[in-house]
Amino acid sequence: LYVSFIGSDFVEEGRRAGRWLLEQFKDATEPVNIVELQGTTGSAPAIDRKAGFEEVIKENPNLKIIASQTGDFTRAKGKEVMQSFLQAHKDIDVLYAHNDDMGLGAIQAIEAAGLVPGKDIIIITVDAVRDGMQAAADGKINFIVECNPLLGPQLMDAVKAVVEGKEVPKRIVTEEGTFTSEEAKAALPDRKY
């Protein structure tokens, strides 16, 4: 029915977020308390990003998700849920948000609570949209895993291959990167989204 699927690997996005966190806290001997803003309940990105993240962080028993709730991929809900997390937990070390918008909303809540995002609470997000990249460049987001919407070049390569009678993989994973604060600063001027 179809020749190939081109898109993101959401599990791998979660793994990349987890690997970065694992590296940052490799010497941790005390609990590292993580709160998680999940995407829309039941959506593939929310399920898969959570699974990939958890798969990796379980390597360090000090990394603990102490609260996890949907933020519906929106800035407003991310802010609202983060406010609840901050009221319920006084010892949050890390926020993992399944997208930049929820992370940006959470930053508003963190700042309103008198805390410094990116310093008092380490922030990891997924997407790498312009606003998220700017927040990373400003030091408010520590690490972003890209979810690249620019599929055109990979799509055209696959179409040309099919037209030429060549075999193409059933699944082609989008080319995506990761960004620390410094890398976001460098990449921001050339971002297309």
PLM features per residue range, with description:
Residues 1-8, 39-41, 66-69, 91-94:
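Second-shell loop/turn segments in exported
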Residues 9-13, 17, 32-56, 152:
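Extracytoplasmic ligand-binding site segments that recognize negatively charged/polar headgroups
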